[in-house]
Regions:
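Phosphate-rich ligand and nucleic-acid binding surfaces
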Residues: 33, 212-217
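Generic start-of-chain signal for non-secretory N-termini
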Residues: 19-40
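Short, Lys/Arg-enriched N-terminal segments with co-localized hydrophobic residues
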Residues: 1-19
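Polyanion/phosphate-binding surface patch
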Residues: 65-115
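Short, surface-exposed recognition loops or helix-turn segments adjacent to catalytic cores
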Residues: 196-207, 223, 301-306
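Positively charged, Gly/Ser-enriched RNA/tRNA-binding surfaces
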Residues: 21, 41-56, 67-70, 103-112, ...
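Beta-rich nucleic-acid/ligand-interaction surfaces
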Residues: 62-82, 201-213, 307-315
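Acidic, His- and aromatic-enriched active-site or binding-groove loops in soluble protein domains
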Residues: 82-94, 216-237, 323
Length: 344
């Protein structure tokens, strides 16, 4: 009897050990599974976007999920660089680390990381163009539809892995590119029957002029990153954070003047003494005039001087798209980046 009891206890313990050793099925935070019903809908959206891209003459490319770390860093600002998913070197990489020398995190990262998951599709595209420039006919219109990864804090509408659908033109400085991309947005949302869409537009040159008038040119990147958070934290907290940077409180009235501008005419009185600001204003006027002549099917183009988009590589007009009937933040964005390929 004692022998049988011991066997019973033994098998019970083995069974419990087996149950406890099994891994609970889960996925990392900020990542998602998609069942078949969702995939049918996603594929319909992707096919609609793809068809619109090709109707406008854009050709497809793909780039690797991983890029060399130096390709990605330094393009998105300090905050963006922190959100890059870094990939540890394979093999016994720690054996090559000098613990006495590599004491801070930046030096340690250089020793153990050579690759990273792509943060967006724009910088890999710039790398692709620089690497294949002898085989490309310019102007070059490309589209790319692939996953990107960001080491962000997961929250509603914000994930660590998500899909981007990009269309870019490279090799021309014509502002008709911006006009066409606004029409392309309008085409896609009309085909998808998404109503009440606003395409907000601003220009980095106008932001540059604003910061210049605030006597804070050296803080431009920091101010733009803070301004990019205005929808999340509100204007008063934006002002507080800018003041903490060292901007004189009296200069914040200039910020108010710009944010209160609702039209090209409002801006012209603020920018008439600035060469850079006037150029940005001319670019915006060209785009508004042409969109007014061509018309949009369902979207609305609107000036938003608070629009900053905190990516370092933008040089001209910037865009952000919102579906006003849904509270999920922006559903699209972009802008002009004239000098990005020159870094490669």
């Amino acid at each position: 009897l004692a022998s049988n009891l011991m066997k019973f206890i033994y098998y019970i313990l083995r069974y419990l050990q087996t149950i406890m050793s099994k891994t609970k099925p889960s996925i990392p935070k900020g990542m998602r599974d998609f069942n078949s019903n969702v995939m049918f809908r996603r594929n319909y959206i992707f096919e609609t976007v793809k068809t619109a891209f090709e109707c406008y003459g854009y050709a497809p490319i793909e780039t690797p999920a991983m890029e060399n770390i130096q390709t990605l860093t330094g393009k998105y600002g300090d905050e963006g660089d922190r959100l890059i998913f870094k990939v540890l070197n394979s093999g016994d990489f720690l054996s090559k680390v000098n613990i006495d020398k590599d004491t801070d995190s930046k030096n340690l990262t250089k020793s153990i990381v050579e690759k990273a998951l792509r943060y967006d599709l724009t910088v890999p595209f710039a790398r692709f163009v620089a690497q294949n420039r002898n085989d490309i006919t310019f102007p070059y219109k490309r589209y790319q539809m692939q996953n990107v990864w960001r080491a962000d804090r997961p929250q509603k509408g914000r994930f660590r892995e998500f899909f981007q659908c990009d269309a870019d033109v490279i090799g021309t400085d014509s502002l008709l590119c911006e006009v066409e991309l606004i029409q392309l947005y309008d085409e896609v949302f009309t085909k998808l029957k998404i109503p009440n869409v606003t395409i907000a537009i601003n220009n980095r040159k106008i932001l540059s002029c604003m910061v210049e008038l605030m006597d804070a040119e050296s803080l431009f990147d920091d101010i733009v990153i803070i301004l990019d958070k205005i929808d999340k934290i509100g204007i008063e907290k934006v002002k507080n954070e800018i003041e903490i940077l060292g901007v004189d409180k009296s200069s914040l009235s200039i910020l108010d003047s710009f944010l209160n501008a609702k039209s090209i005419d409002d801006l012209s009185t603020l920018l008439n003494k600035s060469e850079v600001g006037s150029k940005g204003l001319q670019e915006l006027k060209f785009i508004f005039d042409n969109i007014s002549k061509l018309g949009l099917q369902s979207a609305c183009l609107s000036l938003d001087v608070s629009l900053a988009r905190g990516l370092n590589y933008y040089t001209g007009c910037i865009l952000e798209v919102k579906a006003n009937d849904v509270v999920i933040g922006s559903i699209g964005g972009g802008g002009r980046y004239d000098n990005l390929t020159s870094i490669f």
